[in-house]
Structures are given as structure tokens and as C-alpha cells.
Curated annotation (Swiss-Prot):
Its cofactor is pyridoxal 5'-phosphate. This is Aldolase vrtJ. Belongs to the threonine aldolase family. Coiled coil: none annotated. The keyword tRNA-binding does not apply. Pathway: Secondary metabolite biosynthesis; terpenoid biosynthesis. Viridicatumtoxin and its derivative, viridicatumtoxin B, exhibit anti-methicillin-resistant Staphylococcus aureus (anti-MRSA) activity. Moreover, viridicatumtoxin and a C2 acetyl analog, spirohexaline, have been demonstrated to inhibit bacterial undecaprenyl diphosphate synthase, a potential new target for antibiotic development.
Length: 388
């Protein structure tokens, strides 16, 4: 019996071609460049690792995926990804969500069920600065922000100094601590993370990790996924930043937390039908980019960029521990706006002094960046000579 075309694609996803490539071949072109075949503008974009483009391998996985209904919990691809992520992180269950913001907000709300309650977190964290006040609107909780004394990452001492124990009738007690690892590319060391975990659990305070870029900390050798995730009651990990998937994150934790988060996800419109379409790409992202070692290459490039900047007289505002390079522009008399404008003239995209080096950044972009760095440093030394 002859296999059907669909069955052939399921067993041989590498044979899948994008529509534009098929049309190109029909028109006689030998090879077409599509949005899926190369990174395009992402190769020159240092704004964020969210600009990474999905790959042809992901497209093949999408074309070969299962198409069952996830609201009925019947899609093998979606269930398989969730179970696999739970296994990788050492948790009991996982839940696919459309974004890191949704993963964080579901995690927070799943923990906070009886107000009054407050959340303790770093003042610079994504939860505070980039999630549209979701903790207040979705969980009815107060956020207490902490600025780490060391200027890099939260410590047990920082938390102890700001925890609200709810001893007075006027208090809003701390019920949840949310950490972000890494934050701004800086890693919270595993031993300090474990101390925070032991302290919080002794206080009866739950712990959630915004691990959108936890992959980067693991790739840097700070600890394994299981090591870090063991410190928390829930963890959100993103597939669409440095890993390059088009969409999605996963929330991992206990089965009870997963079921509560799934109910909340549905209540805010996050339930999905044929979720295998995006889960298939997410699995490829983990396998090819994280397990395939591409993040380590990005880290090496980031270190090279940081070293180039420093050996030519530049300063960094944070150490380069993962894929982010923080330039001290103020020290050389440049503003973020000036960097953005000049970068655009050179075909480079920046969002400020933070450079994010993802795995699709090309050699040409690195060369242009180095030329720009020299320009910045020369002009800065002329305009703002340093004390000898």
C-alpha cells in the first residue's frame, strides 16, 4: 500500500517546504530565500533575543504536528511537550502558555488565593517593569520592590530586610517571593538561590521563578535546570526568546498548581485548540538551540564583544555572564538615543546600552559593532578625557 503524502511528511518532516519555496520552484527558481531560511534582519538586531526567527526545522515540525484539541487535553504534541518539560525541570507537571508574561501571571495568581497578600521581588524585574501591572489587576496583590544591596542580584539579607510578616492589622503580608534568573544577564548563584529557598520555605512563603532566560544561566554553567527549579514552587520558562520559537512558554510545578493555573489560563482567554502547531516549534527550539549548544556560542560572542569594548577603554555597567553586554555610555558622553540613531545609520538595531547577543547575530553585525565601538570610544575620549 502506498503511503499518503501526509503520512510521508509525518515520518519525514525534513521534506516539508514552505509555500513560498514551493511557488518559487514552480516558477523555475533553483533556490528561494524565505522568511524561514535565514535570520534576515535579526542578524543585525541587538535589541533583544525576542527577535530571533523560527527556522525551517521548526516549520517542518509544524507541518508534521498533531492537530487535536488541547482544551480537551487530547493533543499528543502539546501533552508531550508539557510532560517533557516537567521531566527536564524535575517538576510534576507542565502547562503550555502563550507568553512569559502569562506564565508569570498564572504562577503568581495560582499561589495567591486569600488576600490580603503581597509579592516581594526585584525592582528591576520583568514582573514589575514589563507586565502591565498584571499582579495588581489579575491577583489583587500588592508588589513590594527591592533594590539589591550588591547592585546585581537578590540575597536572603535583601529579602529579610523587606519581608512583611503580617504582625499588624494594617499589614499586607508577604505570601510570595518572585525571583528572575538571570536578570539583566546577571546570574543569581545557585548556592545563594538555595539559601533563599530554605529561608522562604521556613517562613511559609511560596517561591516563583521567572525563568524566561533560565536556559542562559544553565548554558553558562551555573547549575542544571533541575538544580535551579528545585528551589521554587513554580517556574516559567520561555521558548521564544533566545531559543527562537515563534511563540510560547511553559509553567512547571505541582499537579495541583498546574490544574489551578490551567483554570486561570482559560478564564483570561489563554485556552488553545490546535496547540500542537506552536508546541511542535517549541520542542525543536529546546532541542536544537538549548540542548544543541547554540546558547554557549552566543555567550562566547558576548564575552568577545565585552572584551573588545574594555580593552579599547570602555566600561561595563554589569558583568557579562550570559548573552548580554551592558555598555557604560555615560562614561564616554554618549546617550542611548545617540547609539540608537548611529546604529540605524550602520544597519544595526539597538534599544539602548544593553546589547543582547542571540545565536542568529551574524559576523557582519559583529564587525560593524566593533567599528561603532571604536567610534564611540574615540569620540568619548576626545570629548570627555579621563583623569590620568
Amino acid at each position: 500500500m502506498t503511503n499518503s503524502p501526509i503520512a510521508d511528511l509525518v515520518h519525514h518532516p525534513e521534506r516539508v517546504q514552505s509555500p513560498s519555496l514551493v511557488n518559487s520552484k514552480m516558477n523555475g527558481d533553483a533556490k528561494a530565500v524565505t522568511e524561514w531560511t535565514e535570520p534576515g534582519p535579526a542578524a543585525f538586531d541587538f535589541r533583544s533575543d525576542t527577535v530571533t526567527r523560527p527556522t525551517e526545522q521548526m516549520l517542518a515540525a509544524i507541518a508534521a504536528t498533531t492537530l487535536q484539541d488541547d482544551d480537551f487535553r487530547q493533543d499528543p504534541t502539546t501533552l508531550g511537550l508539557e510532560a517533557w518539560m516537567a521531566e527536564l525541570t524535575g517538576k510534576a507537571a507542565g502547562l503550555f502558555v502563550v507568553s512569559g508574561t502569562m506564565g508569570n501571571q498564572l504562577g503568581v495568581r495560582a499561589h495567591l488565593q486569600s488576600p490580603p497578600h503581597s509579592v516581594l521581588c526585584d525592582a528591576r524585574s520583568h514582573l514589575v517593569t514589563h507586565e502591565a501591572g498584571g499582579v495588581a489587576s489579575l491577583s489583587g496583590a500588592m508588589v513590594s520592590c527591592v533594590t539589591p544591596v550588591n547592585g546585581r542580584y537578590m540575597t536572603q539579607a535583601d529579602l529579610e530586610a523587606h519581608v512583611n510578616r503580617g504582625t499588624l492589622i494594617t499589614d499586607c503580608p508577604t505570601r510570595l517571593v518572585v525571583l528572575e534568573i538571570p536578570l539583566g544577564g546577571v546570574i543569581l548563584p545557585l548556592d545563594k538561590c538555595r539559601r533563599i529557598s530554605e529561608w522562604a520555605r521556613a517562613q511559609g512563603i511560596a517561591l516563583h521563578l521567572d525563568g524566561a532566560r533560565l536556559w542562559e544561566a544553565v548554558a553558562a554553567g551555573a547549575g542544571s535546570l533541575r538544580d535551579y527549579c528545585a528551589c521554587f514552587d513554580s517556574v516559567s520558562l520561555c521558548f521564544s526568546k533566545g531559543l527562537g520559537a515563534p511563540i510560547g512558554s511553559v509553567l512547571v510545578g505541582s499537579e495541583t498548581l498546574r490544574e489551578r493555573a490551567r483554570w486561570i489560563r482559560k478564564s483570561i482567554g489563554g485556552g488553545m485548540r490546535q496547540a500542537g502547531v506552536v508546541c511542535a516549534a517549541a520542542r525543536v527550539a529546546v532541542e536544537a538551540t538549548f540542548l544543541g549548544g547554540l546558547l554557549k556560542r552566543s555567550h562566547a560572542r558576548a564575552r568577545d564583544i565585552a572584551t573588545f569594548w574594555e580593552i579599547h577603554g570602555g566600561r561595563l555597567t554589569y558583568p557579562t555572564e550570559t548573552n548580554m553586554v551592558w555598555l557604560d555610555l555615560e562614561a564616554v558622553g554618549w546617550t542611548p538615543e545617540r547609539l540608537i540613531r548611529r546604529g540605524a545609520e550602520l544597519g544595526l538595531r539597538f534599544m539602548g546600552a544593553r546589547l543582547v547577543v542571540h545565536y542568529q547575530i551574524g559576523d557582519e553585525a559583529i564587525g560593524r559593532l566593533q567599528d561603532l565601538m571604536l567610534e564611540i570610544l574615540v569620540s568619548g575620549l576626545v570629548d570627555h578625557p579621563r583623569d590620568s
